[in-house]
From Swiss-Prot:
It comes from the Bacteria. NCBIfam families: PRK09194.1, proS_fam_II. Homodimer. Pfam families: HGTP_anticodon (PF03129), tRNA-synt_2b (PF00587), tRNA_edit (PF04073). Keywords: Aminoacyl-tRNA synthetase, ATP-binding, Cytoplasm, Ligase, Nucleotide-binding, Protein biosynthesis. It comes from Clostridium botulinum (strain Eklund 17B / Type B). It catalyses: tRNA(Pro) + L-proline + ATP = L-prolyl-tRNA(Pro) + AMP + diphosphate. This is Proline--tRNA ligase. Its main location: cytoplasm. GO terms for biological process: prolyl-tRNA aminoacylation. Belongs to the class-II aminoacyl-tRNA synthetase family. ProS type 1 subfamily.
Length: 570
């Protein structure tokens, strides 16, 4: 591509709206332009980079035996209603009506569509396994779009769905996708780590996320410093401390006027917050759920929602619901005598002795409460882990980092096939539901994450495999016919080798051309200037020192970079 013919407009200043490196650099390099909140146009340079990521994904998916197709982005409500998710998905779904008042949505995800296709097209176990995928634009009405394409309302996603006849088949399909994802992110030059995750609105049993560490990430990721344990904070657990061994003491109600919070109660009673248990009340599908965790812990609402079999988001109980359940003011609720439809007790509480809780009476708490003797409930893990706790696998130290999700794989099982009556004829001649898996990659988010991990003060530093262009050939003075002639010859030679090259033949100062090449992140630069009188040009990697080389050798130097990166020229 000759830059004199290219639609490109780089920015020297950082746009005020941009908060993170990828957003700043995608705007400054001319990759994207904002259309509306969370909605972007992909300019030629941005689209070319996006297609590079898509091509890698497509190659690895095809290699893993998946078949590409393209589903409709507009989905009739009936499909979502058949799975029970039309109401459960929530406000993020863009819902529309046609002229006949029929309900549709712009697909935020495509489980129902793929399941419906399998239901109609796959009749026998002899046709299984099948893995279908698409690369398509998705739509989600994010409450707060931010960070450019990292969290936008319109984004490109690769979603794949496997259909198997049994659990063993699903395990094989899941493992194939895991291996494909590892290859995809490695080829993209992205340092992504697979972590245990919650299935969220997608549902199903097992799931894992591919996360990239990022200071601006929206998820907390828990890692063990000693072993390979890693999990999203929504899923992470810690090794349970040994049970306290104390002689049980009779309960005692004590006056705690104006002491509502854990810190206030602990100070008033001169005890550690670790000797208290706090109460949180939730409304889950119209039922009141009481959750009890140690006073210094934070409730994990995802774990609570899963334990409560919530159909959607859960919310804190209203003041009226709180009063009906406890009969007291805020800050004085406790487990003894509470009126709740479901009582969830964190397993850590079960191991505590003689702790303090609210008395369900305003101005009072109860000392020396013990689980089993004084109250009971459903024991489980309902809290967030904290930095420094013991790893559940090896006992090592847990550490927490911020991260961004770029991929997610699920074992759906029969969640959708049973709900939508999607069945096949099994080997025994009877109908059976498909055993499904779901595998997603955020393509636009992956591209932005690559930029987050590969940049410097001068701009993007694209890995060679995903760079929109491999080489920038710069004619320093376009009024010098010999410079233009040699630059054009090198440009054509590189193209004939399969190298994607830019010829900067613009009538601009050399400094402008160099800065544009750097901010765009082009991995290699060949500068054709005054040294051509000696048969030489300058060769420079995006990060590296400039070398003066013979004109006849420079194309082989470019090829050598492909060899170093184990990349084939097309």
């Amino acid at each position: 591509m000759k830059m004199s013919n290219m639609l490109i407009s780089t920015l020297r200043e950082v746009p005020a709206e941009a908060e993170i490196d990828s957003h700043k650099l995608m705007l400054r390099s001319g990759m994207i332009r904002k259309m509306a909140s969370g909605i972007y146009n992909y300019m030629p340079l941005g689209l070319k980079a996006l297609k590079k990521v898509e091509d890698i994904i497509r190659e690895e998916m095809n290699e893993a035996g998946a078949q590409e197709f393209l589903a409709s982005a507009m989905i009739p409500a009936e499909l979502w209603q058949s799975s029970g998710r039309w109401d459960a998905y929530g406000a993020e779904m863009f819902r529309v009506k046609d002229r006949n008042e029929r309900d549709f949505c712009l697909g935020p995800t495509h489980e129902e569509v793929f399941t419906d296709i399998a239901k109609n097209e796959i009749k026998s176990y002899k046709q299984l396994p099948v893995n279908l995928y698409q690369i398509q634009t998705k739509y989600r009405d994010e409450r707060r779009p931010r960070f450019g394409v990292m969290r936008s309302r319109e984004f490109v996603m690769k979603d794949a769905y496997s259909f198997d006849k049994d659990q063993q088949g699903l395990d094989l399909s899941y493992n194939k996708m895991y291996e494909a994802y590892v290859k995809i992110f490695n080829r993209c030059g992205l340092d992504a780590k697979c972590v245990e995750a919650d299935s969220g609105a997608i549902g199903g049993s097992n799931s894992a996320e591919f996360m990239v560490k990022s200071e601006v990430g929206e998820d907390d990721i828990v890692f063990c410093t000693e072993c390979n344990y890693a999990a999203n904070i929504e899923k992470a657990t810690a090794r349970l401390e040994e049970a306290e061994k104390e002689e049980l003491i009779e309960v005692e109600k004590v006056s705690t006027p104006d002491s509502r919070g854990i810190d206030e109660v602990s100070e008033f009673l001169n005890i550690s917050s670790k000797k208290t248990v706090k109460t949180l009340l939730y409304n889950v599908d119209g039922k009141i759920v009481a959750v009890f965790v140690r006073g210094d812990r934070e409730v994990n609402e995802v774990k609570v929602a899963n334990a409560s079999n919530a159909s959607g988001d859960i919310e804190m109980a209203s003041h009226e619901e709180y009063m009906n359940a406890t009969g007291c003011g805020i800050g004085f609720a406790g487990p003894i005598g509470i009126k709740a439809d479901l009582i969830l007790v964190d397993k850590e509480v079960k191991n505590m002795c003689n702790f303090v809780t609210g008395a369900n009476e305003t101005g009072y708490h109860i000392k020396n409460v013990n689980y089993g003797r004084d109250f009971e409930g459903t024991i489980g893990d309902y809290r967030n882990v904290v930095e420094g706790e013991a790893c559940p696998t090896c006992g090592g130290k847990l550490t927490i980092s911020r991260g961004t999700e770029v991929g997610h794989i699920f074992k759906l099982g029969t969640k959708y096939s049973e709900a939508m009556d999607a069945k096949f004829i099994a080997e025994n001649g009877k109908e059976a539901p498909f055993i499904m898996g779901c595998y997603g990659i955020g393509v636009t988010r992956t591209m932005a994450s690559i930029i987050e991990q590969h940049n410097d003060e001068n701009g993007i530093v694209w890995p060679l495999a995903v760079a929109p262009y491999h080489v920038s050939v710069i004619a320093v003075n376009v009024k010098d016919e010999e410079q233009v002639k040699i630059a054009t010859k090198l440009y054509e030679d590189l193209k004939s080798m399969g190298v994607e090259a830019l010829l900067d033949d613009r009538n601009e100062r050399a400094g402008v051309k160099f800065k544009d090449s750097e901010i765009m992140g082009i991995p290699m630069r060949i500068t054709v200037g005054k040294k051509i009188v000696d048969g030489e040009v300058e060769f420079k990697l995006r990060i590296g020192d400039m070398e003066v080389v013979k004109i006849e050798d420079v194309c082989q130097m470019v090829k050598g970079e492909f060899d170093k990166n184990n990349l084939k020229l097309r």
